[in-house]
Amino acid sequence: MKRIVIFVLLSLIFLLPGPLGASPWQELSSPYFTMRYQEPERKMALFLLQRAEEVRGSIIQDAGRAPPAPTLIYLAPTWEQFQEVQPQGQPPTWAVGTAYPEHNLIILKSPRAVKKGRSEVEEVLRHEYAHLVLARALKGHEAPQWLDEGFAMLQSRGWSISWTYVLSRGVLSKALIPLTELSDGFPLDQYQAQLAYAQSFSFVSYIKNEYGAEALARLIKGIAYGLDAEEALRQATGLGLGNLERGWKAELKKRYSWFPIATSFFSLWFLASLLFLLGYWLKRRKAKRTLREWEQEEALQEPPFPPGSFDDEDRE
C-alpha cells in the first residue's frame, strides 16, 4: 500500500507544471483552431478563438481554399516568448504577428506585450490567417509580396486614418515605392515598411474596386495555375502591372494629395492661430467703431461752450 501511495505521489509530481513561477503553455481547441496561451491570457485566448471561428468563412470566400484544420495559434505574453516560438528566424522588432503557411501556424503578441486592445489584436489575427488562406489557395506558388500583404490587409479590415496619412504623405512627397520593388520583399526600415503595407492594401483594393471581386479571384487562380504575376494580372484585368500602377497612382493623386495639408499638426495649429488673430482683429475693429460712435454721440450732446468758460463778471 505504501509503494502505491509513493507511486501516485511521484506521478502527480511529474504532472506538475514545473518550478514555481514557470508559465507553461495552456491549450484550447475549437473545430478549426488550436490556441496556446499562458494562464493570465485565458480570457483573451477564448475571445480570439471564438473570433477566429467567426471570421474564417469570410476570409476563405475571397481566396477559395482553407488551410487544413486545426491551425495552431500562439498568444505570446512577452516579446521574449514571441521570439522563442518562432520556427525560423527572428521577426522585426515592430512585428505584432507572424504567419507560417508551411507550419499552418500563427504567432501573436498579446495585448499585454503591445499595449493594444482586443480589436487591434483581432485585426492582426485576421491578417495572419489571411496569409495562410492565400498560401493554401496558391497551391505552393509564390505571390508577389504586394499581393500577399495587400490581400491580408484587405481581410483584416484594419485600415485607419493613420494608414491614410502614411499613404498620402508618400503621394505628396512623391516617395511611393515602385510595385516592382515590392514583389520580392518589403523594406526593413519601419516607415518604408509602413508605406509598403499601405501601398499594397491600396493597390489590391484598387483592383477589387475597379475590376470587381472576381478579378481578384482570377488573379489568385492565375498564379495558382502557374502564371507569373504579370500574365495573371493581364488575364484578370486586361492590363499589365505598369498600366494598372499608372491608373492606381492617378487615383491616389486625386484622393490623397490634400490629406497631409488638411491634417498635419502644423496646418491645424496655423489655422487655429489665423482664426484667433482674425477674431482678435474683428473684435478690435468693432471696439474702435463703437468708440467712434460714442464720441460722435457725445459731441452732439455737448453745449457750445464748456461749463466754466465764463466767470461771474462776464455774465454781468
Positions of PLM-derived features:
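Acidic/His/Gly-enriched intrinsically disordered linker/tail segments
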Residues: T93, G97-L108, K116-V124, R136-F265
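Short linear motifs in intrinsically disordered
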Residues: G18-L20, K221
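Beta/coil-rich, acidic/histidine-enriched accessory regions frequently appended to metallopeptidases
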Residues: E27, Y191-Q194, Y225-E316
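Bacterial N-terminal signal peptides
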Residues: V8-P17
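Positively charged n-region of N-terminal signal peptides that target proteins for export
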Residues: M1-I4, R315-E316
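A short alpha-helix capping/helix-coil boundary motif
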Residues: R3, T34-R36, E128-Y129, L182-G185, ...
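Juxtacatalytic substrate-recognition/specificity segment
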Residues: A22-P144, A196, A229
